Amino acid sequence: MSGVWVFKNGVIRLVENPNQSGSDTQNRRKVMVYLPTGEVVSSYSTLEQILQSLGWERYFGGGDTDLLQFHKRSSIDLISLPRDFTKFNSVYMYDIVVKNPNYFHVRDSH
């Protein structure tokens, strides 16, 4: 994971490879791979099925309609994702990887 962490208006976010040209940045988009099958996660329906198989459940108590949230009864972890899959980026991917070690991997798309 390369880039620069930017703190603005009380929010910290990762700006990946800020010095790369636009075409290079577009070619280096990240994808998340489900390791047991080698499948690239390409939609929320696929991701939700995988997360449910790992014990995650949809969480509807957050009140924010712009987010899809998942929780695990056996932990205090909460996964929050933008409802629009086109906004699903490496920050959200790495959050899932950290909370599900050995099941997911983030890599550059080809």
Swiss-Prot record:
Stored InterPro entries: FPF1
Top-level lineage group: Eukaryota
Annotated GO biological processes are: positive regulation of flower development; vegetative to reproductive phase transition of meristem
Signal peptide range equals none
- In the UniProt entry for this protein, what further remark is given in the free-text comments? Overexpression of FPF1 results in shortening of the time to flowering.
Instruction: Please report which protein family the annotation says this sequence is part of.
Output: Belongs to the FPF1 family.
What is the documented function of this protein?
Modulates the competence to flowering of apical meristems. Involved in a GA-dependent response in apical meristems during the transition to flowering.
Q: What is this protein called?
A: Flowering-promoting factor 1
Q: Which organism is it from?
A: Arabidopsis thaliana (Mouse-ear cress)
Question: Which gene is the coding source of this polypeptide chain?
Answer: FPF1
